[in-house]
Amino acid sequence: MNNILSFEINEIRNILQGWGEPSYRADQIFDWIYKKLVLNPLDMTNLSKTLRQKLLEYFSFQIPKVVRITGDGNTKKYLLELEDGENIETVLISHKNRNTVCVSVQVGCPIGCKFCATGLIGLKRNLETHEIIGQLMVIQEDLEKKEEKISNVVYMGMGEPLANYDNVIKSIRIIKEEWGFNIGSKHITLSTIGIIPKIYQLAEENLKIRLAISLHASNNELRSKIIPINKEYPIEELLESAFYYAEKTGRRVTFEYVLIKNFNDRREDAKELVRLLKGKPAHVNLIPWNKVREYPWETSDLKDIFRFKEILANSGINVTLRISYGSKIKAGCGQLRALYLKNKGETI
Ligand code: SF4
């Protein structure tokens, strides 16, 4: 059955037109769903009984089931179950009046980065648009209890957003548009490992969302060791596509850089990064490595973390040191799901 959360308003208008209904009914339906969070069409009381019944028969209104919520200070992590029994996770980070939701886009991930728990799973499947939107509905329902709203969305959970392009783009429209979640494009960030052709495609979508690129190394030799796809999409070409995106959208690009001890946190790595980004519309997020048992990498020493940051800052690079709020409750990429499956006796 078609899940209504996969549809944009124009598509619903067309369907309703075919049913002989006026187009404003679509606005009423979306108002119930996205503003009042009503997911039972029978409760949409300003619609005729016939239309309510028809909606019930034609569409599914299902959202993912919450299996477990873990919380630690500012971070809440939701382990969700999809209709086919697969698990995904969504993270809510509440900080300084902001409620940022980190959504997943795939069950597992095909990229296989050598520092990521999700990379160990491999790709099981892409999420449908409604499964991405459903994650936001679950969290908005939870936030509603304290009369708060989602303010920011980051595509930074399980999976590579640009490897599930069509569903991700559609979900961004639903999140962004007034008839949907009505969250402005500057509050939406898509984080990618760097699938170059899709970055160019994204630049042409006129979405003007923020783009973050997981760089994690300042030369191809190092980057290819932890991000296999770098062999196909090397750093120079990746940066070219990123700066094209910046030029097209007027938004500087964020480069995520996970600092790993004695691997990419040395003085020469910082200097090399400066050479790549100096004078460019770029911002660097430094993230000290969040240890995953399955990988040998160690967390950088504090003095090396601060030295790295200082070299960038002193060279005029915009840089932020980000402490991962999720790390204490295993909110890093894919870790809660991995733990859950382990407890269920499944292998990942
Ligand atoms: S870091 Fe991102 S792209 Fe790489 S394996 Fe993990 S989820 Fe996939």
Swiss-Prot record:
Keywords from UniProt, A to Z, are: 4Fe-4S, Cytoplasm, Disulfide bond, Iron, Iron-sulfur, Metal-binding, Methyltransferase, rRNA processing, S-adenosyl-L-methionine, Transferase, tRNA processing
Q: What does this protein do?
A: Specifically methylates position 2 of adenine 2503 in 23S rRNA and position 2 of adenine 37 in tRNAs.
This entry's Enzyme Commission designation comes to 2.1.1.192
Q: Please, what other remarks does the record include? A: Reaction proceeds by a ping-pong mechanism involving intermediate methylation of a conserved cysteine residue.
Which cofactor(s) does the record list? [4Fe-4S] cluster
Q: Which HAMAP family match?
A: RNA_methyltr_RlmN
Reaction catalyzed? adenosine(2503) in 23S rRNA + 2 reduced [2Fe-2S]-[ferredoxin] + 2 S-adenosyl-L-methionine = 2-methyladenosine(2503) in 23S rRNA + 5'-deoxyadenosine + L-methionine + 2 oxidized [2Fe-2S]-[ferredoxin] + S-adenosyl-L-homocysteine; adenosine(37) in tRNA + 2 reduced [2Fe-2S]-[ferredoxin] + 2 S-adenosyl-L-methionine = 2-methyladenosine(37) in tRNA + 5'-deoxyadenosine + L-methionine + 2 oxidized [2Fe-2S]-[ferredoxin] + S-adenosyl-L-homocysteine
Q: Which family does it belong to?
A: Belongs to the radical SAM superfamily. RlmN family.
Pfam families, per the entry: Radical_SAM (PF04055), RlmN_N (PF21016)
How many cofactors are bound and how? Binds 1 [4Fe-4S] cluster. The cluster is coordinated with 3 cysteines and an exchangeable S-adenosyl-L-methionine.
Query: Which protein are we looking at?
Result: Probable dual-specificity RNA methyltransferase RlmN
GO CC, any one term: cytoplasm
Note the PROSITE patterns from the entry. RADICAL_SAM (PS51918)
Q: Which residues bind [4Fe-4S] cluster?
A: 109, 113, 116
The enzyme's main class, written as a single word, is: transferase
| Single GO term (MF) | rRNA binding
Q: Where in the cell is it found?
A: Cytoplasm
